[in-house]
Amino acid sequence: LLHVLAGHAVCRGTAGAHFTGLLRRSFMGYDVSFHPISPEEMREWYFTPLSWVQQGQEEKVLALAAQHGMEDFYAEKYLDTLRVGAGTEPDELFDKSHGFYIAVIQGFFRDYYYTRGSAFSFLVEEKPEYARYFTPWAQVTPTAFPNPAENQIIENYCSGVYLSPKQVTQLLRDLEQDPKVLEDLEGLWSNGQLAVLKKALTAAAELGVGLLEATEVVEPNPIRPNESTSYSNLYHCDRDGVYLYIDTVSTQLADVIGKSEEQA
């Protein structure tokens, strides 16, 4: 089903084969974002307001947004996101519906962080032992949901793993004290990206909250940055990872142009 969410088309459904995910990662890439949020905030900002929308009490959502100083434009986007969430069918993947929407709504309340193509979901595919840092949705949601969950990124427009507040502090500690953890993460978050991930983890730790990853909440345009888009609040996206992406693409373009000139 194709739903329109705040002026953008969002493809929703239960499809999400692992093979499809690998293909997309190889050829299309992923815009990965990291969202500091606690289970309590998920309840306060998403699950409870979701029930308000389902009960026809949308004015409560706008009151909550105003209470947090949210601008009217983003308050409406917030409400639109909850409306889409309220229409989620019980057989839709949690990761492609509620999980993704939680990442979106987090960005209306506070900053989130971006890295191109690097995610814990991809790390745990190669190194399953890293699952010790993640908490499945069944242990996070305030009530049981019928929606099946993969608990990781399986395709675009999808939530990934969730690190609890304790897991955030544990991973930060291990990054400092365990050379193997540092090496493994540097292997995936390369070319300066690890600093962005540590910034996200540190922000979450300082707030005493967990960290949720997702894909395509924000989609930077490295060629025309002013045309970047976000289902959430674009201005709450930390710029460091975006600048790294722009620099990488600029370097790649320069290489391509240089080679084509050599061949001419």
What are these regions, as identified by a protein language model?
Residues 1-27:
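Short, Lys/Arg-enriched N-terminal segments with co-localized hydrophobic residues
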Residues 22-264:
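Acidic (Asp/Glu-rich) sequence patches and key acidic residues
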